[in-house]
Amino acid sequence: MAKIAKQLTDLIGNTPLLELNKYSATKHLDTPIIAKVEYFNPGGSVKDRIALAMITDAEQRGILKPGATIIEPTSGNTGVGLALVSAVRGYHLILTMPETMSVERRNLVKAYGARVELTSGKDGMTGAIRRAEELKREIPGSVILQQFENPANPQTHYLTTGKEIWEQTEGKIDIFVAGVGTGGTVSGIGRRLKEYNPNVKVVAVEPASSAVLNGKPSGPHKIQGIGAGFVPKTYDASVIDEVLDIDNDDAIRTGRELAANEGLLTGISSGAAVYAATLLAQRPENRGKRIVTLLPDTGERYLSTVLYAFDEYPL
């Protein structure tokens, strides 16, 4: 039987797992860290999953009409996913994002036909959310899908990503590690894995300089895609066993090591997740345990950032 997708959205999900053998060897780990490589999604990130899920959910509930305008505050990857799905399904899209987001991300969504409105970097995602709400009041029939509150966000990870990880590992997983932006990824996957095996440990990752999940003040950081500066409604603390706070430089250094050692060109948040997984693997009590982490996106949209600014930001 021919395997031909009818539309691009049919290719979202079912991303591969990869053993980080060379990286793990350089860190002298007993067991290689395993990575779910989400840049194999057609839009280049894990956020393709929630973009498709939120739009489909809004269609099914009748709140998103044909040809309507979708508005979304986003730090980048969700915007790319929404732009891709909107192009396929015929929606107008306006994205609000902090001006600190990379130029590649802005231009990428524009290429799909989206309109971008930049907000003050010092206001973080809070400013982007505020501007999105203003636009919704101005544009009749528009819809904000609101990834930070939408239950379809964690639910799609429960239904797809978590199930994929369990099946790909044949149930042999002890610890799952993921960064927290909206919290939907770690919450949905964590809930599914704990249903399969309550002993699976779920670890969330956030920037050390904006460690709100650990009760510390929000602040600026360099790890794009995680650390929104507030605790999202889509974050389910009940499935989280531990939250690790990761420094900017450790995330950046690890991201560079993944490219140099594994040929994995990923984003800064992938570096944070793998560094957190490394810290866990180095604990004596975790010796020999299988640790799976998730690499949210491709590094191609970070080439203008500190991640690959080797001369200007040496480590």
Report residues per predicted region.
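PLP-dependent amino-acid enzyme catalytic core
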Residues: 1-315
